[in-house]
């Protein structure tokens, strides 16, 4: 009769689900107040005018308008430009 010692169990083989981070509204896209523009860890992109910053560093629109991304002094900034009423 063949004998074989029981194999040890592996402690690997797990992974956490992705956190769905990133830009949710592109440059020039229309937003309404409360729309999430960017989900991020830390302020990789900084808030500009007419946007708010959540406690988890989520950037969201405060007014109705169009999203605008720009770079100032090596900082990426996101603004919401108000749509001119005609």
Swiss-Prot record:
The keyword NAD does not apply. One of its GO terms (biological process) is translation. Pfam families: Ribosomal_L27. Residues 1-24 are annotated as: Disordered. One of its GO terms (molecular function) is structural constituent of ribosome. GO terms for cellular component: ribonucleoprotein complex; ribosome. Keywords: Ribonucleoprotein, Ribosomal protein. The keyword Coiled coil does not apply. It comes from the Bacteria. HAMAP family: Ribosomal_bL27 (MF_00539). Belongs to the bacterial ribosomal protein bL27 family. This is Large ribosomal subunit protein bL27. It comes from Rickettsia conorii (strain ATCC VR-613 / Malish 7).
């Amino acid at each position: 009769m063949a004998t074989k010692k029981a194999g040890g169990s592996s402690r690997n083989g797990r992974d956490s689900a992705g956190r769905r981070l990133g830009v949710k509204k592109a440059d020039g896209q229309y937003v309404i107040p409360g729309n999430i523009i960017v989900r991020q860890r830390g302020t990789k992109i900084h808030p500009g005018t007419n946007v708010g910053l959540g406690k988890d560093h989520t950037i969201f629109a405060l007014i109705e308008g169009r999203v605008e991304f720009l770079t100032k002094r090596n900082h990426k900034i996101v603004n919401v430009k108000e749509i001119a009423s005609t």
